[in-house]
């Protein structure tokens, strides 16, 4: 099963979403445990670690999309490794 497409694919999308919803960097990034300065670096095109991308999806996607990602992660963790 393929992983669900994450809601953000670029720093520009993240910044636009944050501004559209009237949040400052501290509010937006704090929801996923990232400092304002860390969020600022991510919004300046620094690579965003996959765990942070996943948290952003869970925090800001619709409930249905968030649940699909969590379900996928749970199944992925419990599926046997091929050849093991």
Residue ranges and their predicted role:
Residues 7, 25, 48-49:
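Alpha-helix N-cap/helix-initiation sites
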Residues 48-69:
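DNA major-groove recognition helix of helix-turn-helix/homeodomain DNA-binding modules
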């Amino acid at each position: 099963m393929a992983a669900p497409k994450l809601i953000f694919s670029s720093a520009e999308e993240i910044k636009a979403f944050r501004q559209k919803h009237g949040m400052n960097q501290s509010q937006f990034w704090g929801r996923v445990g990232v400092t304002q300065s860390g969020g600022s670096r991510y919004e300046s095109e620094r690579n965003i670690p996959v765990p942070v991308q996943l948290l952003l999806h869970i925090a800001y996607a619709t409930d249905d999309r968030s649940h699909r990602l969590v379900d996928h992660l749970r199944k992925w963790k419990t599926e046997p490794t091929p050849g093991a």
